[in-house]
Amino acid sequence: MAAKIRREDEVIVLTGKDKGKRGKVTQVLVTEGKVLVEGINLVKKHQKPVPALGQAGGIISKEAPMDVSNVALFNSAAGKADRVGFRIEDGKKVRFFKSTGELVK
């Protein structure tokens, strides 16, 4: 099945502590059904120093994966979250916004 949300897409968070925030998808974890969104769902990780690799220890913030059902593609023309469909144009399968019918970049 084709992915409705792909890397580099701009998405809006639908649920959770970051509801309403927008960000760019940095990674899609297809087998787990999760996405990593830049600057969203940040968690603190306590990291031990690794002198052999020259890494300092401390507390770092990093993005945690969130379920793909908790984000929606952001339609900048409409200014809101939108659903995505697929259609065939010129022999290629393309994504389009269901509310406006225009193609996703």
From Swiss-Prot:
The answer, when asked if RNA-binding is one of the entry's keywords, is yes
Q: Which Pfam families match?
A: KOW, ribosomal_L24
Q: Which UniProt keywords apply?
A: Ribonucleoprotein, Ribosomal protein, RNA-binding, rRNA-binding
Quick one: a GO cellular component term?
ribonucleoprotein complex
Instruction: Provide one Gene Ontology biological process annotation.
Output: translation
- InterPro entries per the UniProt record, alphabetical: KOW, Rib_uL2_dom2, Ribosomal_uL24, Ribosomal_uL24_CS, Ribosomal_uL24_KOW, Translation_prot_SH3-like_sf
Question: Which residues lie in coiled coils?
Answer: none
Q: Which GO terms describe its molecular function?
A: rRNA binding; structural constituent of ribosome
Cross-referenced NCBIfam families: rplX_bact
Annotated function = One of two assembly initiator proteins, it binds directly to the 5'-end of the 23S rRNA, where it nucleates assembly of the 50S subunit.
Oligomeric form and interacting partners:
Part of the 50S ribosomal subunit.
Question: What's this protein's family per the entry?
Answer: Belongs to the universal ribosomal protein uL24 family.
Protein name in UniProt: Large ribosomal subunit protein uL24
Organism placement in taxonomy: Bacteria, Pseudomonadati, Pseudomonadota, Gammaproteobacteria, Aeromonadales
